[in-house]
Amino acid sequence: MKSVYHHFAIIFFLKLFLCNCILSIPKKTLGKGLFSLGLNEFKNNVDNNSLNILGELKNSKPFINKSFIQINEKKDNVLLLKLYKQNIASDKLSTYYGKIAIGENSENIFNVLFDTGSTEFWVPFKTCKFTKNNIHNKYERTQSFKYKYDDKGLPSVLEINYLSGKLVGFDGYDTVYLGPGFAIPHTNIAFATSIDIPVLEKFKWDGIIGLGFENEDSQKRGIKPFLDHLKDEKILTEKNYKNIFGYYITNTGGYITLGGIDNRFKRSPDEKIIWSPVSTEMGFWTIDILGIRKEKQPYMNERRDDEVIVKYEGFHDGSNKSIVDTGTFLIYAPKKTIENYLNDLTINSCEDKQKLPYIIFQIKSKEIESIKGLSVIELVLSPNDYVIEYIDEVNSTKECIIGIQSDEDNINGWTLGQVFLKSYYTIFDKDNLQIGFVRNKQTINDETYLNESFLRVSKKRNKKKSYNGPL
């Protein structure tokens, strides 16, 4: 029997493995603390690069006092949600989470994982048997809570099965707050009454907000995914925002930009975003990776990590539906690609990093001139991008591993996790069903790239239209 950590892996998030969902029966004022972000706390929770990017916020006092910070309204018209990074030293893992509140006139404050690789939105209910130490926040019913009923008029009950446990609960509705004055009424939420997943005891986040699309399970239960709810109820557009969000992460934290694009997170404010069309049939944000190729490091006096002459040639392994996943750490490649083309992508010491090639992803695009009937863009990862540096806790030495691993389930698609997303400010456009990529502002170097240790194990993806996570 495989251990939990074989599935749990280097990946730090919970990916929902949605199986059979069964349908049968089963007051206080809002705390100001959630939406108060003092300048000192703000400084302590971002790295120096991010502080340079956000330096102009020093004089923006009216905006600092919000969990969602409204910035550059006339220019960018974007909301900013802070992501906190948690390092789990004992298991050599990391995770990013944000804060929300649930319920009118309540103190239901939660740390949540924002996950484009799942659809479910769940938090633990107050009676939930969750962890031994009872360290997680739990939901108490509010005046704005409503049950969701099935077609028999009974409360809708769910069971979600994971590889290492299960979650049981019921469906309901309540108001979700992302900041003062930014409420999302009547949001579909699953309230867990029993969670038998021991590894959750290690995480600071309490639940998951799935940012994926409708799938077979949500259709069966009559659940509207979170992003669909935002769009259908015009939560953003009525406030003159767009139905898009961006994902920007650094070595110490990050931000979700909601409703617009924050140009300060680009490497250059004027740098163009390149877009790839999204397909939704799998329930995830999937794009077509047409192939990849390797290039030797270019010789130049002032090298930029993605500055390489692109060529529309190289190794093409066919059009693969691939997931852009904010809940996965590594990049997972099709097994045949690792075996047939990237089999020499190995490293014995950190010094070997200089010998590694640039990896160029050839991705279907809407905009670039057509090549053999396909519109193609190329995104580049340097060895600095995909090699993970860490400190060996036993020997206190710097070690390196490759952040691109094989998907052992023989699934043809890729999973672009946070190793990839750390290099690109990534925009998820709900209205136009496209994902935008632009090199981010963060400069990664040998000393600051990653100082945490990570456990090198594997994650599995299941058959089409389902997704296996680390549990």
Curated annotation (Swiss-Prot):
Keywords: Aspartyl protease, Cytoplasm, Hydrolase, Protease, Signal, Zymogen. GO terms for biological process: proteolysis. Its main location: cytoplasm. Coiled coil: none annotated. Its EC number is 3.4.23.-. GO terms for cellular component: cytoplasm. It is found in: Cytoplasm. Residues 96-438 form the Peptidase A1 domain. GO terms for molecular function: aspartic-type endopeptidase activity. Residues 1-24 form the signal peptide. InterPro entries: Aspartic_peptidase_A1 (IPR001461), Pepsin-like_dom (IPR034164), PEPTIDASE_A1 (IPR033121), Peptidase_aspartic_dom_sf (IPR021109). Disruption phenotype: Normal blood stage development in the mouse host. In the mosquito, development of oocysts, and sporozoite gliding motility and invasion of salivary glands are normal. The keyword Protein biosynthesis does not apply. The active site is at D115, D325. Pfam families: Asp. Belongs to the peptidase A1 family. This is Plasmepsin VII. It comes from Plasmodium berghei (strain Anka).
